[in-house]
Amino acid sequence: MTQDEMKKAAGWAALEYVEKDSIVGVGTGSTVNHFIDALATMKADIEGAVSSSEASTEKMKALGIPVFDLNSVDQLSVYVDGADEINGHMDMIKGGGAALTREKIVAAVADKFVCIVDNTKEVEVLGEFPLPVEVIPMARSYVARELVKLGGDPVYREGVVTDNGNVILDVYNMKIFNPKALEEQINQIVGVVTNGLFANRGADVLLVGTPEGVKTVKP
C-alpha cells in the first residue's frame, strides 16, 4: 500500500465520525483532501462544512459541499484534520501547509478532533518536523531571535503568505518533550499569532492509515 493509499484509507475512515445534519469542521492538506472526497458522497446528509483554509474551501465548493463562515456557526460536532507529526499523547505538530492559525481556531470550536494520518506521521518525540510559527511580518526578526533563545533554529519560509496575510518561521532542531508548555511559551512572544503545536487542544481520536488497514487510537 502506498503512502497516498494509506492517507486515503484514513480519510475515508473519518466519515464514521460525521453526524447526520451537522456542520463539519474540515482541515487542510493531502490527507484531508481524501476526506473531502469522502464527505462529498454524503453531502446530502449534512448541513455543510466550516473550512480552515482557502484551498479546502475551493475544493469543497467545487464538489458541491456548502461552506459556512465560522462566525455564523455556534458549534461543530467534529473537526477532521491531518498532522505533520503526532505523539502517543495525541499532541501534534501541524502547519506544514501554513494554515495553522485557522486550523487551531476551528479545532477550538469543535467538540471532537479526529486526526487522520498515514503511519509515517507517528513519532515518540515531536520536533523532527520543523515547528511552524505564524508571525506578524514586522516582528519576524524579533521573533526569530526569541526562538533562538528557546533552542531552535528558525528559518523564514520564503514566498509564503498565510491566508491571514502573515509569514511563517519554521523552527528546526527542537526536541519537544513538553509540548503544552512550549506551545504557551512561544505564543507569549510578542508578534506571534500562533504556533503549530496542538497540545493544549490535542486530538481526541487518531485514525492511522497503515499497510494492514486503518488503526484507531484514543487517549
Curated annotation (Swiss-Prot):
Lineage: superkingdom: Bacteria
Subunit structure: Homodimer.
Name the record gives this protein: Ribose-5-phosphate isomerase A
Pfam short name (any one): Rib_5-P_isom_A
Binding site for substrate: 28-31, 81-84, 94-97, 121
Annotated GO biological process: D-ribose metabolic process; pentose-phosphate shunt, non-oxidative branch
Keywords on record: Isomerase
One example GO MF annotation: ribose-5-phosphate isomerase activity
Biochemical pathway: Carbohydrate degradation; pentose phosphate pathway; D-ribose 5-phosphate from D-ribulose 5-phosphate (non-oxidative stage): step 1/1
Catalytic activity: aldehydo-D-ribose 5-phosphate = D-ribulose 5-phosphate
Higher taxonomy: Bacteria, Pseudomonadati, Pseudomonadota, Gammaproteobacteria, Alteromonadales
Active site: 103 (proton acceptor)
EC number, as in UniProt: 5.3.1.6
SUPFAM superfamilies per UniProt: D-ribose-5-phosphate isomerase (RpiA), lid domain, NagB/RpiA/CoA transferase-like
Family: Belongs to the ribose 5-phosphate isomerase family.
Function summary: Catalyzes the reversible conversion of ribose-5-phosphate to ribulose 5-phosphate.
A Gene Ontology term for the protein's cellular component: cytosol
Species assigned in the record: Shewanella loihica (strain ATCC BAA-1088 / PV-4)
